[in-house]
């Protein structure tokens, strides 16, 4: 149970559009593809860590104490998984877009996967550069299958430590018991993405000033324990449980005291993901 100073990673909201597609057909690929991603390329891949701590005064956003602990923990964890880690600090929204564009244009053909971690303030659908918001969808679109061909069919993981709104979770007491590939196979451009959000849609995300955020602490801990034993979704389920059961906010302000948090995983992965082979 955490009892140090806790903070949140919050800010503004955006509309989104719903499109309806009429008609469909069944497609038989003619081949039973491997059930897990090929992870034995010469390189595991790049892991970008965007760590935004200090924000322009015009944004009205506070400094994110504890985020450097997260960045260091993530660097150690993903280097241990053989990723090429690139730490980027205090990027403006323009810097972030330029970085994503640049990395997406690299040749990833000898890399097994791609990881991007964003530590910042946020709200539903947006994260904050040091000078203002940028849509998360705009950042991830650079890595779609039709734009970044050398990552097509490979896992692209986006890990987001940021608020997704201003709701607070008070918690509730429980009463419970104890490849072979086909040359011309077509896949959706949004396939093979996974988004690991620190909190559920609409909610605050908590961060400890000394130990870092609840989510990143838990993610790194579970990866170090299970990355060479379990499939990634199973690891993330353990992360969810750890955050949900082992953390609670402590604040002198009763509005923010004794609050809970649950991470949210959105997966468009099409195969199982193991960090070992």
Curated annotation (Swiss-Prot):
Which reaction(s) does its UniProt entry say it catalyses?
Strict requirement for an Asp residue at positions P1 and P4. It has a preferred cleavage sequence of Asp-Xaa-Xaa-Asp-|- with a hydrophobic amino-acid residue at P2 and a hydrophilic amino-acid residue at P3, although Val or Ala are also accepted at this position
Name by which UniProt lists this protein: Caspase-3
Q: Which residues carry this modification: N6-acetyllysine?
A: 11
Source organism phylogeny: Eukaryota, Metazoa, Chordata, Craniata, Vertebrata
Q: What PANTHER family has UniProt attached to this entry?
A: CASPASE, CASPASE-3
Give the enzyme class.
Answer: hydrolase
Keyword RNA-binding present in the record's keywords: the answer is no
SMART domains from the UniProt entry? CASc
What residues bear N-acetylmethionine in this entry?
1
Q: Give the gene symbol.
A: Casp3
Compartments annotated for it: namely: Cytoplasm
Q: What does this protein do?
A: Thiol protease that acts as a major effector caspase involved in the execution phase of apoptosis. Following cleavage and activation by initiator caspases (CASP8, CASP9 and/or CASP10), mediates execution of apoptosis by catalyzing cleavage of many proteins. At the onset of apoptosis, it proteolytically cleaves poly(ADP-ribose) polymerase PARP1 at a '216-Asp-|-Gly-217' bond. Cleaves and activates sterol regulatory element binding proteins (SREBPs) between the basic helix-loop-helix leucine zipper domain and the membrane attachment domain.
Pfam family for this entry, one: Peptidase_C14
State the active site. Answer: 121, 163
EC numbers for this chain: 3.4.22.56
The protein's organism comes out as Mus musculus (Mouse)
* Biological process per Gene Ontology, one example term: execution phase of apoptosis
- Please give the superkingdom of this protein's source: Eukaryota
Main localization (coarse): cytoplasm
How does the annotation summarize its subunit structure? Heterotetramer that consists of two anti-parallel arranged heterodimers, each one formed by a 17 kDa (p17) and a 12 kDa (p12) subunit. Interacts with BIRC6/bruce.
Q: Which GO terms describe its cellular component?
A: cytoplasm; cytosol; death-inducing signaling complex; glutamatergic synapse; neuronal cell body; nucleus; postsynaptic density
How is activity regulated here? Inhibited by BIRC6; following inhibition of BIRC6-caspase binding by DIABLO/SMAC, BIRC6 is subjected to caspase cleavage, leading to an increase in active caspases.
UniProt xrefs under InterPro entries:
Caspase-like_dom_sf, Caspase_cys_AS, Caspase_his_AS, Pept_C14, Pept_C14_caspase, Pept_C14_p10, Pept_C14_p20, Pept_C14A
Family membership noted in the UniProt record: Belongs to the peptidase C14A family.
